[in-house]
Amino acid sequence: MKMTGWKKKLCRGHHLWALGCYMLLAVVALRLSLRLKCDVDSLDLESRDFQSQRCRDILYKNLKLPAKRSINCSGITRGDQEAVVQALLDNLEVKKKRLPFTDTYYLNITRDCERFKAQRKFIQFPLSKEELDFPIAYSMVVHEKIENFERLLRAVYAPQNIYCVHVDVKSPETFKEAVKAIISCFPNVFMASKLVPVVYASWSRVQADLNCMEDLLQSSVPWKYLLNTCGTDFPIKTNAEMVLALKMLNGKNSMESEIPSEYKKNRWKYRYEVTDRLYLTSKMKDPPPDNLPMFTGNAYFVASRAFVQHVLENPKSQRLIEWVKDTYSPDEHLWATLQRAPWMPGSVPYHPKYHISDMTAIARLVKWQDHEGDVSMGAPYAPCSGIHQRAICIYGAGDLYWILQNHHLLANKFDPRVDDNVLQCLEEYLRHKAIYGTEL
């Protein structure tokens, strides 16, 4: 009799335990279904649930980037000087500096792609119908600092876009393998089919972009515009904001294109030869082909698909390309000159009224050291709050408010080893704005 009672208690205990487990699983399933409902509904892009605050909150909670430092990013993005000073002081504390992720880290974590994408918080579905219907192409030229590349890719990534990655042939093998491992996790990210050794200020920097252009035109993705990036770039607009800006171009391109100074004219007066670096020769060059006037700009462009097609297929474009191959830093005058060529789609006339400065174009926001100064006295921007490299500002936290006031799509230069706080706050700002459509 005692045994029977014990068995009944045991069975009752098992029953209650099983019921408790069932209820717990039901709650978990309900929460999971709500989460999946928000995600799945957002995929069809017509869901009112996705527009709801609740679903946005769930989405943001799952996609919010983990803060590495306890700094006031909301204050920094709004230009609060106390928050900026605290971030700059925080950045000076060596003990708080985090070592960047290594090639080995990415080789290991990408063995499980789903875990990698979830842990690193990649957005894996379009956030709006407008974005889905307007895919963007990227040519990404990199050679070092694997974490910089992964964070840049994460910041510009959207599944409807297409990304070509060119890795310098001279890069260490472990870096190349880490890049391959990262891009293997995404169906719309690929390595350029032809890789070249990139030498500073030489033709090879242009060739890297041309190789990606060829590959991107072969893609089945109907991209509308091409943006090119390097490893020290970072977006300052969300993908939705980029789509809006590109639509407003209405087929035009956007890149710096100005009359060259006498100093810059010397870049194509004599031929240059390349070994491990660029060497000036005494051989004078012939004038540019087709009596084309030369213009100068920078390496970055926002180019329509039709412009890219004409770069690769138009005989006049090809003649100019051949002519600039032995000049100094051809990326800084090839695109600028093609932007003024009358046969190029989306170009603008030679006339001085159409000169475009780097501040007017939307391609890239850069602080040049020799232009920094007192804005109240006419300087275009205040001094860099980070450090300078080749007379270009590597941004600090004190630059972020100014950066976000500009209309450019991307900015240069960022380096987490110089100031990771500015990148952390920019990442947080962009992710919040992508989900909620509002600033921090």
Curated annotation (Swiss-Prot):
It is found in: Golgi apparatus membrane. Signal peptide: none annotated. Its EC number is 2.4.1.102, 2.4.1.148, 2.4.1.150. It comes from the Eukaryota. Glycans are attached at N108. GO terms for biological process: protein glycosylation. This is Beta-1,3-galactosyl-O-glycosyl-glycoprotein beta-1,6-N-acetylglucosaminyltransferase 3. It comes from Syncerus caffer (African buffalo). The gene is GCNT3.
